[in-house]
Swiss-Prot record:
One Gene Ontology term from the biological process aspect of the record: double-strand break repair via homologous recombination
Polar residues bias locations: 368-377, 458-471
Keywords associated with the record: Chromosome, DNA damage, DNA repair, Nucleus
Compartment annotation: Nucleus; Chromosome
A single GO cellular-component term on record: Mre11 complex
Known partners and oligomeric status: Component of the MRN complex composed of two heterodimers RAD50 and MRE11 associated with a single NBS1.
Gene Ontology MF terms in the entry: damaged DNA binding
Top-rank taxon, per record: Eukaryota
Recorded name of the encoding gene: NBS1
SMART domains cross-referenced by the UniProt entry: FHA
Annotated spans, Disordered: 368-431, 444-506, 528-580, 630-654, 692-954
Residue ranges annotated for the BRCT domain, each copy included: 107-186, 244-349
Lineage of source species: Eukaryota, Fungi, Dikarya, Ascomycota, Pezizomycotina
Protein name from the UniProt record: DNA repair and telomere maintenance protein NBS1
SUPFAM superfamilies: BRCT domain, SMAD/FHA domain
Amino acid sequence: MWILESELFDGKRLWLRPGKTYLFGRTVAEAGQLTISDKTVSRKHLTIHIDNVPEGGGRNLRSRSNVIVEDLESKKGTLVNGVQIRGQKTTLTEDVNEIKLGLCPKTLKIRWHPIVLSFSFTSKELRADPWTNLRDSLEQLDIKYSAEYEPTTTHVVSKKRNTSKGLQALINGRYIVTDSFINAIVQATEIPEGEEGASSALEQDFEANWPNPLDHLPPRGEEPGNHTTETYAPDARRQEVFDGYTFIFYEKKQYDNLFPAISAGKGKALLKEVVPNRTRVDEFVRYVKSVAGEKGLGSFEDGSEGKGVVVVRYTPKGEDSAWYAEFFTKFAQQLDHRPIDQKEFLEAILACDASMLRRPLEAMSQPVSVSASVEPQSSEKVRPAVEDRKEVEQSAPKQLQPSAEVPATEESAPAPHRRERRTGRSRFKGFDFDDDDIIIETPQAQSSTQVPALPQVPSASQDSLFVSQREPSLAPSEPMLEEEAPCNTRTTRQTHRKRVLSPLPEHDNSALLDEIAPITAAVKRRRIEAGQDPVPPLPEPEPEREDEDVEMVEESPPRKGKKGAATTAKGKGKKIKQEDEENVLELARRRREEAEAAAAAERQRLAQLGDDDIDYAAIRRLHIIEEIEVRQPEPHGPNRTREQDIADGRWDPRWNGRKNFKRFRRQGETGVRMPVQSVIVPLEEVRTKEYGIGDDYWLEDEEGRVPRRPKETQTQERSTIGSVRDGSGFAAAAASGKGKEKDKENEKEVGRPGSSAAAAKQRSKPAPRRTVLTLDSSDEDEDEPSPHAPGIDTISDSEPEVVSSFPSVIPASEPSRSRAAKAAERANALRSSAHSSQSQTQQHRESQLSTGSSKIQLTLAPGSSSLSFSRSGTAAGRNENGKRPFGSFVSGESTASGRGMSVESGSVRGESASKRQKQGSSGGGSFLATRRKDDGSEEESEDDELKFRFGRRR
C-alpha cells in the first residue's frame, strides 16, 4: 500500500488507492483535489496516478502497483527525488520518494507500506479454495496474502493463538488476528454510496481508520495462563527467547511444525525418531545425554535447571498411545527431567523467559488426589501441573488415591503442631463407639488403601527418597489433617497418615540393584548358583555379662517421658563402644580370611581341571558386551578441496592469505611434526673496564703459556744483542729444538750444562725462537764436540738464553714480580752473553792457527750481479783429532739482490754437510771478503767479516 505523508496535512497519513488519480494545486478546482497554499505552487501543479493491481498481484509478495507523477507545466517546476520534471512524467521506483512542489519548503513523501497476511489454513479449508474470496477483497487494495509465513509477513490470520505461525509472529514482533480483521480493512476502504469523488476513510486518515490488530485477537483456547490482550503486542525481547536451549523431538510431524518457531527464537531443534515397540528407552536417553555433552545414563548433571536440553513429549491417540505414554514416562524418570508439551511454548514466549520449560521432574510431581483436596488456586496455572502428573505417574497404582482423600466434614478443634513424629500413642481414647463399627471401619480403610501395616518408626531412606518430593505440595494440607485427627477413632487414626508412602514393586528390586551395583549383583547370582548364601551372615556379637549390664544401667538411670514410659539414655558407654569397634575389626579379619581361602580353593580347583572340563560357554556368558558408535570417515577424506570447505562452512574466504601462526594441521595429516629447535645461549660475565697493565701481564693463560711481551721490549732486546755481536765480531747463536733431547745436545756442544736446562725448565713452553747460522771454515771434524768449536746458539725473540759464569742477580727459582727485577735480569744476561762471546772468539782463533786454516774469497765482478767464491789453502797434516781435513772447496754461484745476498748452492765442508742436514742445522763460518779492482788487483778486507744466514741477509 502506498502512503502519502507531509506536514501540509497536519501530520496525517493518506492512503493512495490503486486506480485513482490525485490532483495537487493552489486552489480547489474539482472534487478530491488536495490544496497546497503556497505562492510558488500553481493552481494545477501536479498529478499522482496509481495504476491498478495486475491480476495475481496479491499473491506476488515482491510486486507493487506503479505510481506515475506528472508535472502540469507548472511555473516553478517539480523536483522528484532531486530531479526536475517540469512538464514531464516519471515513475517512482524507490520505497520512499520525496516530491517538492515549486519553492514550497514542505515536501511530499510517498512511502511503500507493505501489508502481508499469512493465513493458517487446514487441509480441509485449502480444498475449499479460499483464495478466490481473498483475491476479490484484498488484491485491489494492494494487500498481499500467502499460505506460508514469510519474512515480510505483518499479520498472521488464524483461529487459534497457539499455532506454529502464531509463535513465529510473536517472536518476530508481528500480530495474530482473525478473519474479522480483514473485514475491518475492507470496511475502512469502502467509498460512501451516492458521493462521487469522495474518499474512503483510509484515504482521509490512514492512522486513525486502520483497524487495531489487538482488537481482533483469536479467542483463548487451551493454552496455559491468562494473559491480557496487551501481552500479545510486539516485543523485541522475544527475538532471542530460546537462545541457549536445545529442543529434542521424537516425532517428525511435530518437529516440522515447531522447528520454524524455535529457529526464529535463536534456539536449536533436533529430531530423534522413535519406532513404537522397537526403540529402547536407554538408547533414547543416551542420545539426549550426548546432546547435552554428557555420557552414560541417569539424570542431567545440572539438575535440569537453566539453559540446556529440553525434551518435547508426544502423546498421540490410537493404538500406540499406551506405548508412547510408557516410553516418555520411563525416560523422564531416568533423566529426572520433565518433558514439556507443545502448548507451553506460548507461555514462555509471552513471558520472554524460556527457563520455565526446563525443570526437574520432582518440581511438578504432585499427586492428583492430594491436589484436589487443597484449596483451588488459579485454574490456568494448576492445569498443566495436573496433566503432567497424570501422564508421568501412569505406572503408579490407582489404589493410592483414596488413601490421600480426607473427608471435609470431619473437622474439630486444631491439635498443637508437632514438628516430629511421635512413636507413642495419643492420649485421646476416642468416642464410645461400638466395637462392630470400629472393626468394620478398619478393614475398609486397609482394603481401600491396600497399604500394609507400617511400623511405628518408618525407614529414613523411604522418607528421603519418595516423600520429600511431595512435601512442598502437602504443606498446606498438614494443618487440616491435624485438625481432624481428634475426631477419628484410635484405629482410624492408626490407618491414616499425613504422607502416603509409594511402595516399590517387588520385581523392580533386582533391576534397580543391577543398575546401581552391577558387580555386586553378579557376585550375588554366582553365589546363588553355587548353592551358597547370597549374603554372608554377620557374626553374632558376644553376649554381655550381667554385672556389666547392671553397671551400665546404674550409670544411666531410667527417666520418664511425657507419657510415663521409661526410657533409657541415648548413649551406651565407652566399654560397649570399644567392644563394637573390636567386633568390626574381627568381622573384617574374618571376611579377609574367607576371601583368601576362597581364592586359594579356586586356584587349586582350576589347577586340577583339564582343558575339557572348562565350560567356555559359561565364561562367555559372563562377558559384558556394549555397543558404541564408531565415527564414520568423511566421504572426501583428507583430499577435500577449498571449494568444498567453503560450501560446507568449514572455511571462510576471509581467512585466505593469513599466516598459520599457531601451526594448525589438517585432520588426518600424516606429516611428521618437526621438533622445535632449542637454542642454548651461553652467558659470559661482562668484564669491567680495567686501568693499567691488568692481570694478563702477570698470570698465565688457560694452556699454561706466558703471554707475549710488548713489541717495544722485543725490539730493545734485539738491538742489544746485535750491538754485542757487532762489537765482538762473532754471533753467539744457539739452536735448540722443542724436545728435551735437543736441549741436551745443545748443552754438550756449547759446554754450558745446566744453564740452558735450568732456563728451559723455568718456562713451561718456550716462546718463538730464531736460529742464527754461522759458517766456519776450519778443518776441524765435527764428529766429536769441542769446547772451543763454534756451536749453534738459539736466540729467543722474547728473552735470550745467556750462559754466564757469574751468578744471576735474581734466583731462577723465584719468578720476577716487577719490571725493575726483569730489567736487572736482562742486563745480567747481556753482560754474561758478551763475556762468553769474547772468550769463544779468542779460543776459535787460536784453534785455527794451530790446526791450519783456509781462506774463502768472494769475487764480485764489476757490472755483474753474480758473486763467485773459492777456497784456497790446505791443512798441514792431520788435525789434533787424527782426521785428515778435505783439501778442496766446491765452488758455487750466488746472486746478489737489492737488499741482501743469499747462497744458493755449495757447501762449506763436504763431509759434514749431510750430517748437519740430518741434524737440522747448517754450517757457518767467517769469510774474508776480497774485492777485485778495475786494474785486476784484489783488495782484501780482513777486518770486515760478512755474516751470512741461509735464506736472508742480516
